[in-house]
């Protein structure tokens, strides 16, 4: 997937080599800057951009896990468009559905800019901001991206979360498993994934107990207890695990290190993306 997306981007940039005027690439990341799987893509794109003549680039992290209200969403959106008001991008790479939710304002303010949208789902909720912690998003009516294909100049690349295949593998590799724990934060995508996992377990493994452990200051000890335990009756499925807490100055501080215990865990840990495990953390 990474190779294909880099090829598409490189192909799109080829005419720039002959252009005399510098053009601009903007990457808007829904997640935070330390998200492992996203950073893997971003790093490669920035390398390609740096090696492309007449192409400047910039990067914005929306930090979706901190955006739980309309007012915060609107503030971040306003800051993005104000920042590039006099320096409009010629190309866009959008990671995640929160970034893609900016598409109407992108078209209105920046024109019909070519967009590469990278996400885990090929469906969206119209007029949805994908606020973290919003329970409505998971059950809202969705449309396929093909339904809006003619309205926007975008190419979609899916980075799938293979939850069904991963759960099947967990059952095979941990035959004594009686309980599955999905450990994640409350990003909109994880809230939707929680519902999908519950439905799949009900259908395929109705005797398997299920717990969705949501990242927070209060659940920190819970996940640490699971990680240091060798109890084979409990299977751990790792999603992204970020949350905020007040800093010494009273401002929200993003907590990212709880999953560093993975490296010393005596139990097998399963993940929806390999980069979670390579970094000892998650998106």
Regions found by a protein language model. Name each.
Residues 3, 16-283:
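Short hydrophobic alpha-helices and adjacent helix-cap/hinge residues
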Residues 2-12:
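Bacterial N-terminal signal peptides
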């Amino acid at each position: 997937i990474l190779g294909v997306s880099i090829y598409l981007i490189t192909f799109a940039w080829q005419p720039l080599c002959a252009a005399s005027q510098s053009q601009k690439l903007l990457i808007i990341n829904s997640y935070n800057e330390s998200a492992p799987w996203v950073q893997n893509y971003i790093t490669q794109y920035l390398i390609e951009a740096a090696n492309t003549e007449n192409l400047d680039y910039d990067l914005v992290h929306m930090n979706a896990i901190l955006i739980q209200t309309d007012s915060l969403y609107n503030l971040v959106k306003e800051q993005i468009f104000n920042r590039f008001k006099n320096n409009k991008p010629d190309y866009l790479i959008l990671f995640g559905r929160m970034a893609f939710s900016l598409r109407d304002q992108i078209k209105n303010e920046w024109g019909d800019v070519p967009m590469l949208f990278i996400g885990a789902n090929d469906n969206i909720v119209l007029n949805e901001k994908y606020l973290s912690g919003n329970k409505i998003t998971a059950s809202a009516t969705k449309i396929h991206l093909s339904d809006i294909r003619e309205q926007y100049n975008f190419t979609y690349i899916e980075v799938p979360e293979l939850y069904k295949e991963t759960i099947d593998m967990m059952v095979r590799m941990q035959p004594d498993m009686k309980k599955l724990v999905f450990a994640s934060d409350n990003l909109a995508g994880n809230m939707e994934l929680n519902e999908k996992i519950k439905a799949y377990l009900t259908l395929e493994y109705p005797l398997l107990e299920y717990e969705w452990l949501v990242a927070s200051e209060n659940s920190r000890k819970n996940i640490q207890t699971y990680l240091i335990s060798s109890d084979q009756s409990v299977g751990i499925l790792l999603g992204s695990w970020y949350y905020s807490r007040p800093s010494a100055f009273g401002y929200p501080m993003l907590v990212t290190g709880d999953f560093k215990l993975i490296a010393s865990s005596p139990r097998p840990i399963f993940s929806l993306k390999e980069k979670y495990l390579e970094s000892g953390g998650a998106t």
